[in-house]
């Protein structure tokens, strides 16, 4: 009987040694050391490992608590952070920082926004109304589906110095709040998710709508009669392929080069210039006077990331100069 009691006591002591109980400790988090109180699972060295709760203060002195999964003293896995102010964030943590959910992970944000309450999300959109500036920041409305001009989202940015205008493209990371409910201009009821931003930036068209997936520096140049054409680089995106071209006229007359006369062939198929009316890409000048150069972007449909040929037709205003098509074999 005594042996059994001793065994139970030893097991209890071991269990207590592997669990913190309101113990003060310093965690070496990825953004700096934090000293606070920890309760929960620990390893044999007393380091938080498993499920636990850590309470500390930020640099501004505000108290906050993380409760969830720990790995080797770091927030790693599902967790929840609550600030004294009442702010809450829930989600998956990696290296002590919450990981925003985005893309297909938030496709139901606009049908059931209440399911994302306190979740950290990342959205990219276009501002579609005049921003409303207040004492402590700015409120903007964005369409997170830029292509279809849908997915109305209301964003609160607590930074009065942040400059943003109607029709700007923005990237937002923040915490989802209570859905906004109101009426549209026709009296119909609308519901829109709200986000309090922790990260925010103005983007250009390319980064917002067709971000580069892979970029290749090419820098191939061909010259005829002093008229040079250079394929500078290629950018592959999900929605399009961008070819950066430079033309330089050191010839005897005007050099005429039109982007619609630049064609790509790949795997037995021919691709022509694709309209990009909303893009702010630089355009090639058509009729280039002697001694001048021009640079621009020609947009094509989505191509495979495989070798292709681009043929650029051009001519000079000196009809005695017979200029053949500039043909570039692009390999990666």
Regions found by a protein language model. Give the residues of each.
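Short, solvent-exposed, Trp/other aromatic-anchored flexible loops in extracytoplasmic proteins
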Residues: 158-183, 270-322
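Short, well-ordered beta-strand segments enriched in hydrophobic/aromatic residues
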Residues: 241-249
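Short, acidic/polar linear motifs in exposed loop/turn regions
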Residues: 131, 249-253, 304
